[in-house]
């Protein structure tokens, strides 16, 4: 639901910023409200929803009522958030991380979603604790992702309690600053979990669909039925089936990557939320904390390289595209100078890398849940269409940012006066539309497998 709603709003956002088209479709007034909900659906809701999928798949049985209650609340909140831009009083505030609409319906959707995801995080903390401690790397990554999510939710609540209500843009910037930075660790950890799971799946002989596999939408009696746990990779197996990386080493890498999370409560305990040093420390946490992910990223690179001789597979396409886009986003982070569209180019690269990893893992999990094998050219090409469109979109933004085009504006406010600016934003529009097509392809592939078919 979140991915579909985000994709539909993305079409309007792209049209409102594309030279030439922006004059035919004057959507400037709607742009900011659509941007708020697009960001929240595509990053906050979609990422948290798939995080819950990973936690459920890797967690032990028990506390099912927490999972189902969380799902119901999150689904209701997402539905309300999706329609909120079209309801009265949708006054947007374009703060970072979780932008908001100053509207009672949107506020209600945020609280409902937060309650739902809070229950999912609580269940994850109770069920994904790795056993053995250093022998189950994917469970370690999932558990540490849940720890990051818990700290982020706690940071949001803490800031909400202690930060005084001031000018709206500043208030919401401060409110979501600490928790928003913390969520980045959750997304990165779970992205690597998805990479390693995909790589292990591709390295198994069974990754290639065998003769006589079930047709799309037809369950295999040898596979778990819908509603059952999928089987995670054997904990001791190296990623990609061709790398000898021990389970203990991988688990240790996840714990090392999560070490910067210890700084989060320390910042809140020592410096009041909202003060400038508080915000500066979280900015430095990103600079000095993410390099702790380097060993895991290196394993991801080696795993991508190990897949080069494996047969075509939708999950393989997603893995390659995910790593590539995440790398582009990381490079662009070091090119940011000033407040321009290089900033969204950077975070689009990083977040699209996470999205593609989750798409690839969905292709791995669907057959294990009894929905049949993901096969066909559409499935294999979907990650490249989506990732390729996003790459064009990102490069267009980065190009335009180099010529001074500002972020979070649309229509005439962009002041596109030079040919290079127009070329860059034209690339942005073209790439965005291609990416939307890739997103639709993902939804179609999944629905083809999940919807019942007449026999």
Question: Model regions: which residues?
Answer:
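Hydrophobic cores of alpha-helical transmembrane segments in multi-pass inner/ER membrane proteins
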Residues: 40-53, 106-126, 182-196, 289-305, ...
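Internal metal/ion-chelating core segments
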Residues: 133-205, 243-253
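Membrane-embedded translocation segments of transport machinery
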Residues: 245-335
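Glycine-biased, low-complexity coil/linker segments
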Residues: 209-212, 236-238
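Membrane-interface segments at transmembrane helix junctions and kinks
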Residues: 29-34, 95-110, 171-179, 243-252, ...
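Interfacial and helix-entry/exit segments of alpha-helical transmembrane bundles
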Residues: 1-4, 62-75, 134-150, 246-258, ...
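Membrane-interfacial helix termini and the short, flexible loops that connect transmembrane helices
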Residues: 50-68, 83-100, 118-138, 165-166, ...
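Membrane-interface helix-loop-helix modules in multi-pass inner-membrane proteins
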Residues: 11, 15-26, 31-128, 160-164, ...
């Amino acid at each position: 639901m979140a991915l579909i709603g985000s994709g539909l709003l993305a079409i309007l956002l792209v049209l409102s910023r594309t030279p030439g088209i922006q004059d035919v479709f004057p959507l400037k007034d709607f742009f900011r409200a659509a941007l708020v909900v697009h960001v929240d659906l595509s990053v906050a809701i979609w990422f948290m929803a798939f995080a819950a999928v990973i936690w459920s798949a890797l967690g032990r049985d028990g506390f099912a009522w927490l999972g189902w209650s969380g799902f119901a609340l999150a689904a209701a909140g997402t539905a309300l958030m999706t329609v909120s831009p079209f309801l009265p009083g949708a006054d947007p505030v374009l703060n970072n991380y979780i932008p908001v609409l100053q509207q009672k319906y949107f506020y209600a959707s945020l609280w409902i979603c937060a309650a739902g995801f809070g229950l999912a995080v609580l269940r994850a903390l109770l069920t994904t604790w790795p056993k053995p401690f250093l022998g189950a790397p994917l469970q370690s990554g999932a558990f540490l992702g849940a720890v990051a999510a818990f700290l982020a939710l706690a940071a949001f609540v803490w800031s909400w309690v202690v930060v005084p209500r001031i000018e709206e843009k500043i208030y919401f910037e401060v409110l979501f600053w600490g928790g928003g930075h913390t969520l980045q660790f959750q997304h990165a950890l779970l992205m690597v979990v998805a990479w390693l799971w995909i790589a292990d799946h591709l390295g198994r002989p069974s990754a290639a669909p065998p003769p006589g596999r079930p047709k799309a939408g037809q369950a295999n009696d040898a596979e778990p039925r819908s509603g059952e746990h999928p089987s995670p990779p054997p904990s001791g197996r190296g990623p990609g089936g061709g790398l000898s990386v021990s389970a203990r080493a991988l688990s240790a890498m996840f714990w090392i990557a999560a070490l910067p999370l210890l700084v989060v409560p320390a910042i809140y305990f020592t410096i009041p939320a909202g003060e400038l040093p508080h915000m500066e420390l979280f900015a430095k946490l990103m600079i000095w904390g993410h390099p702790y992910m380097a060993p895991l990223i290196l394993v991801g690179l080696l795993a991508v390289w190990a897949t080069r001789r494996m047969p075509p597979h939708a999950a393989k396409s997603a893995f390659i595209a995910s790593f590539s886009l995440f790398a582009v986003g990381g490079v662009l982070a070091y090119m940011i100078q000033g407040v321009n569209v290089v900033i969204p180019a950077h975070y689009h690269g990083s977040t699209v890398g996470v999205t593609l990893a989750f798409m690839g893992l969905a292709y791995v999990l669907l057959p294990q849940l009894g929905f049949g094998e993901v096969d066909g050219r559409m499935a294999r090409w979907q990650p490249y269409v989506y990732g390729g469109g996003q790459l064009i979109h990102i490069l267009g933004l980065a190009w335009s940012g180099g010529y001074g085009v500002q972020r979070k504006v649309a229509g005439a406010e962009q002041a596109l006066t030079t040919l290079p600016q127009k070329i860059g934003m034209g690339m942005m529009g073209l790439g965005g539309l291609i990416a939307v097509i890739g997103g639709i392809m993902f939804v179609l592939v999944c629905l083809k497998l999940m919807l019942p078919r007449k026999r």
